[in-house]
């Protein structure tokens, strides 16, 4: 592996992040085409059902540079697909273009790929390097990797608590509310418990941020009248909940409450990231905030106009 390989792979990762909102449920992927130390094309997967990163990178190459592809290296953050889905196989495209070399960040865990794209390139005589910035490329698509590797959705927990540790009150400010809606737009589904649904009658949609609204689910072991666009999960068992969401093809779920449901997820260990907003006011409420598990690893703290938002990852 060359130092220059890492430089261009970092650019692939940077490009891939542009697909956060619209690429899902597909992975975020970036691609860069390099000839003689110069980038002559680049692209990323913009939207599910549209051209993949490799397709867009090839399309960005000017006509006068197309003859250089046979002496070029293409960098891609995820293994090129080898199957027909909504678009043709990218591995076939790279073979047809005659690339000299292909550098791949990480292998695709999707059952239809899993090394087949890499093998197809090698069988065609293309020099293939795999594993450049592998961990960074896997983290880029931790949601996709979790869904296809662990056969469950990527789970994000979120709550806001007062300075004295209660969650039953108005705590968020305008900025942190905007962050909350940004996270909603980044997830395919949103989940609340019965008590939260009956007390707050939440719409659970995305209003103060650009993007789609997640599919709303309510967890209740009791019969419950819900709006037509809501979905009822009639088991409070966390593995059962996640299995149902997996069968519904939900790759990412945001759990917003209430305290009982959040604590159940935390205690089960079946969560991936957690955002805790800490307010500055004392409200002397009646519902205590969930307690973080020993597996919760603090990775960042953001100060937002008097509020503190801490991000934790499950290190288990």
Question: What are the language-model segments listed below?
Answer:
Residues 110-113, 135-139, 197, 237, ...:
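Short acidic loop-to-helix transition motifs that present clustered carboxylates
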């Amino acid at each position: 592996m060359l130092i220059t390989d890492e430089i261009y792979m970092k650019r692939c990762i940077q490009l891939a992040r542009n697909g956060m909102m619209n690429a899902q449920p597909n992975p975020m992927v970036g691609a860069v085409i390099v000839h003689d130390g110069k980038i002559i094309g680049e692209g990323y997967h913009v939207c599910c059902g549209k051209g993949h990163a490799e397709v867009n990178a090839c399309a960005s190459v000017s006509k006068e540079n197309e003859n250089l592809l046979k002496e070029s290296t293409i960098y891609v953050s995820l293994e090129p697909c080898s199957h027909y889905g909504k678009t043709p196989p990218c591995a076939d495209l790279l073979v047809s273009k005659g690339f000299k070399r292909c550098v791949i960040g990480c292998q695709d865990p999707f059952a239809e790929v899993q090394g087949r794209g890499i093998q197809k390139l090698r069988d065609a005589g293309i020099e293939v390097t795999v594993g450049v910035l592998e961990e960074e490329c896997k983290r880029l698509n931790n949601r996709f990797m979790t869904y296809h590797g662990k056969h469950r959705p990527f789970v994000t927990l979120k709550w806001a608590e007062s300075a004295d540790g209660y969650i039953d009150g108005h705590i968020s400010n305008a900025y942190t509310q905007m962050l909350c809606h940004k996270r909603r737009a980044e997830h395919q589904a949103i989940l609340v418990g019965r008590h939260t649904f009956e007390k707050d009658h939440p719409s659970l949609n995305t209003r103060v941020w650009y993007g789609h609204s997640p599919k709303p689910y309510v967890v209740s072991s009791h019969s419950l009248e819900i709006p037509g666009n809501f979905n009822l999960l009639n088991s409070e068992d966390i593995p059962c909940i996640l299995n149902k969401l997996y069968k519904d093809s939900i790759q990412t779920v945001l759990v917003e409450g209430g305290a009982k449901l959040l604590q159940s997820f935390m205690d089960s260990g079946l969560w991936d990231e957690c955002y805790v907003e800490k307010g500055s006011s004392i409200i002397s409420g009646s519902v205590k905030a969930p307690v973080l598990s020993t597996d919760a690893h603090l990775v960042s703290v953001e100060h937002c106009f008097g509020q503190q938002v801490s991000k934790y990852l499950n290190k288990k």
